[in-house]
Amino acid sequence: MLGECHAHLMMNAVDYQRAVADNARAPREDLVRGFLEEYRRLGISFLRDGGDRLGASRLAKELAPEYGIDYRSPIFAIHKAGHYGRVVGFPFETMGEYRDLVARAKAQGADFIKIMLSGILDFDRYGVITSAGLPVEEAR
């Protein structure tokens, strides 16, 4: 079995701005099916997606069985307002808002919860993270 363990299917791996524009109104089923068909053609039968805020990951999860793909997704990521994560999910400010987002992910069929604990690596500056991490007391 071949698997992809950190995908963001919505991002298309080519042009992020175009990917967002393509899915802005609603996830494009033709594009999602095209990606799933390519994974199948390559012999990939397991895909762990990181989610997105536009719904492409949710649609892919629904369609993947047609392609023989075991597709796991958080549907979307959860991040602290003002911190890294807007690209792939929704923000929270209070623990009540966090709980609401967890319930929303569960209701939409999430296989796991993805919470952004830190920024990402700054590829222009060695060893630098793009934003401060979530405070330890909130991460618990």
What label would you give each PLM region?
Residues 3, 71-81, 86, 94, ...:
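Acidic, metal/ion-coordinating pockets
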Residues 2-62, 84:
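Metal-associated gating/positioning segment near the N- to mid-region
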Residues 23-24, 87-93:
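The substrate-binding groove and active-site-proximal loops of carbohydrate-active enzymes
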Residues 28-38, 91-105:
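Short, acidic/polar
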Residues 29-58, 68-79, 110-124:
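Divalent metal-dependent hydrolysis catalytic cores, especially in the metallo-beta-lactamase
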Residues 18-20, 80-87, 121-126:
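A short acidic, helix-capping loop that chelates divalent metal ions and anchors anionic groups
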Residues 96-117, 121-140:
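Histidine/acidic residue-rich metal-binding segments in metalloenzymes
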Residues 61-77, 129-140:
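Alpha-helix-loop-beta-strand connector modules within alpha/beta enzyme cores
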